[in-house]
Design a protein with these regions (language model features):
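Active-site neighborhoods and metal-handling regions in enzymes and metal-associated proteins
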Residues: 1-287
């Protein structure tokens, strides 16, 4: 390993520590302002795309990274608990998004993993609705997808609440999504095909008649970025390995009606898994 600080010259370091007769591996996201000087200096006998090797290495979090992501998720749990106190009739989605940013600052988080998502009622049917001036009213579902960073590492969690009252239809959709989330999480263990996790969750939702309303993959990998290389989907050819951290986030989105998503981050351990989020997933009606 070679360690350096941001005050060191990366160019001098590369020239000093590399074999100029061998190609130099670079990442696909390497900024041109770093790559072009390397080319000018002929710091290698050519360049190769090393993105896959780097992505695979980043997909396995070491002990320190795991602890940082536990802390980020703990802050996210606290923020979710705090923001529910602001669920009042007439509040807008953008009001809540701005309030959440203040909560994160007060908790000491570094910043946002992504712009927070608040969606009331039928707005939640889009799955990834951008907060607007829609006002909260009784009978609405409230889909909340939020994440903060701690020392550069991301958290991500989704919960869905109901305001003032909940119908039998809303309860059925919620419990269907919750079961899909919980059963997929229970199945996480080293060696399981990631496609199998998607199949478990999707099968539960399909059996209840909502298969066509589950419109995205089950999950994504996460770390220094909110969405990293690797996904939990029917198309994935990968298997879970210890150190992987990914989301499990089934959802049902019913146009002009409602949307429900329940999301946790899950760490693959040597003998099973650890759920990084601890905020309640019980069906919750906010009075």
């Amino acid at each position: 390993k070679v360690r350096f600080t941001d005050s060191d010259s990366y160019m001098d370091l590369v020239i000093k520590t590399t074999d100029h007769t061998e190609p130099l591996g670079i990442d696909k996201k390497m900024p041109a302002r770093f790559l072009l000087p390397l080319i000018d200096q002929k710091a290698a006998s050519g360049f190769v795309n090393a993105s896959l090797a780097l992505d695979q290495a980043r997909a396995v979090k070491d002990i320190q990274e795991q602890e940082l992501m536990r802390k980020a998720s703990h802050l996210n749990d606290m923020a979710m608990a705090e923001i529910t106190h602001f669920f009042k009739e007439g509040v807008t989605e953008t009001d809540l998004a701005e309030q959440l940013k203040k909560i994160y600052r007060d908790l000491g988080a570094d910043g946002l993993s992504f712009e927070p998502l608040f969606a009331f009622g039928s707005n939640a049917a889009s799955g990834h609705h951008w907060p607007d001036d829609t006002r909260l009213k009784p009978g609405d579902c409230i889909l909340v997808d939020i994440g903060c960073t701690w020392e550069g590492y991301c958290s991500d969690m989704t919960r869905t609440f109901f305001y003032k009252n909940v119908t039998q239809h809303q309860q059925e959709v919620y419990h269907t999504v919750l079961k899909a989330n919980e059963e997929a999480e229970k199945a996480v263990t080293p060696g399981i095909p990631l496609s199998s996790l998607d199949q478990i969750a999707r099968g539960i939702i399909t059996d209840k008649g909502y298969g066509s309303a589950f419109t995205h993959r089950l999950g994504h990998f996460i770390g220094l970025e909110d969405h990293e290389f690797g996904d939990v989907s029917s198309a994935s050819a990968d298997r879970a390995v210890p150190g992987n951290i990914f989301s499990i986030e089934p959802g049902v989105y019913l146009e002009n009606d409602m949307g429900v998503r329940v999301e946790d981050l899950v760490l693959v351990t040597d003998h099973g898994h650890e759920i990084l989020n601890h905020f309640s997933k019980e069906l919750t009606v906010i009075d």
